[in-house]
Amino acid sequence: MDALLTKFNEDRSLQDENLSQPRTRVRIVDDNLYNKSNPFQLCYKKRDYGSQYYHIYQYRLKTFRERVLKECDKRWDAGFTLNGQLVLKKDKVLDIQGNQPCWCVGSIYCEMKYKPNVLDEVINDTYGAPDLTKSYTDKEGGSDEIMLEDESGRVLLVGDFIRSTPFITGVVVGILGMEAEAGTFQVLDICYPTPLPQNPFPAPIATCPTRGKIALVSGLNLNNTSPDRLLRLEILREFLMGRINNKIDDISLIGRLLICGNSVDFDIKSVNKDELMISLTEFSKFLHNILPSISVDIMPGTNDPSDKSLPQQPFHKSLFDKSLESYFNGSNKEILNLVTNPYEFSYNGVDVLAVSGKNINDICKYVIPSNDNGESENKVEEGESNDFKDDIEHRLDLMECTMKWQNIAPTAPDTLWCYPYTDKDPFVLDKWPHVYIVANQPYFGTRVVEIGGKNIKIISVPEFSSTGMIILLDLETLEAETVKIDI
């Protein structure tokens, strides 16, 4: 490995002789860096893990019920008929009666064969182990059940509609249908919460030629057994510093690097402390070399030494090498910013919401992707059966759904660990971002979705360790360009 890096540095030094004078890099800073509270930040001294998750579900149902009712009243207002019968509004799930079309608002709950159970994990001494389950669904036995619930009880949802629409635990919706038999409800239509507001997208400024670009990377997954990842990281550093690209003007437009989680490959059950420290030291070296040239935000991810429950708190500064101490001064937050996961911010008026990707990875396990789209450009991973095509379109669909649901982590706390909030649910959106970034995905992809007249740019950021891919997001046009580093 050392020989490879030495050869790489020799080749780079030859290129340096031909480089023109360095350009001034575009400056990109969070518009509200010093004057806002982070909804995902947890005060260490005030944390209390003794509360029940009941409060989260109650807050979620109460908040979304008002939003969903507004939209349901527009679609199924008084006088709305179905097959000649008047459709009634039911205030409670248990008020649903037979042979009468009606609609009701409630929270979805999925009972699935392979969904993890905390009590079983504790009994079997597997609690806290990595979740290797690819799907919670019972594809062959058909034992899975989807229910609508509220404070009064539950009703089983049936019908063809639930096979073509994602129904995920924790999502609050309005359901139109009719009781098929006692305790079951035939679903005919679904209604999502009323559209959210969105800040106006900033207009071009004549005195400012460009808003610049931010580089997005996730899944560096540095470890002690994969030297190729370290070499890729070295090339990434040289690229961002403009040393392996003749288009220096283009590189100078990249004003910030956002590392979206999984910087190190850390599993507490299989990686010892010394191996972790080696990975963190290499990561620190990368930061030490690049920070004089470009500002960096660092989010934690599933593999990182951070909280295992959402929202993940920022890396602790003690994890980094002493060479970075000067950057942890509050005044240097513009240069090195250790942030939460999820992370919301605004760059030059562009609102961005970023997640490390565990939320979408978990939601994927609730849904069996359809095979109706034909062959995808992204082939199925080896070892996966042909009836489970987890392609980029499937994942973009689910990312879009989280915007429709206005909840970026609906499966928390059922199958996604989260902090037991008592008075709020920070994963519930109050406004839509301009850009929604989901990192550590198998594939790259983008999509512009329009909901209620508002446009949201969705970006799927792939793992760098397996794809060598970084994304350059233009804050002026919201175009996403890929750069691939092969070795």
Curated annotation (Swiss-Prot):
Keywords carried by this UniProt record: Acetylation, DNA replication, DNA-directed DNA polymerase, Nucleotidyltransferase, Nucleus, Phosphoprotein, Transferase
Taxonomy, superkingdom: Eukaryota
Gene Ontology biological-process annotations: base-excision repair; DNA metabolic process; DNA replication, removal of RNA primer; DNA strand elongation involved in DNA replication; lagging strand elongation; leading strand elongation; mismatch repair; nucleotide-excision repair
EC number, UniProt record: 2.7.7.7
Principal localisation: nucleus
Function: DNA polymerase delta (DNA polymerase III) participates in chromosomal DNA replication. It is required during synthesis of the leading and lagging DNA strands at the replication fork and binds at/or near replication origins and moves along DNA with the replication fork. It has 3'-5' proofreading exonuclease activity that correct errors arising during DNA replication. It is also involved in DNA synthesis during DNA repair.
Protein name (database record): DNA polymerase delta small subunit
Species in which this protein is naturally found: Saccharomyces cerevisiae (strain ATCC 204508 / S288c) (Baker's yeast)
The encoding gene: POL31
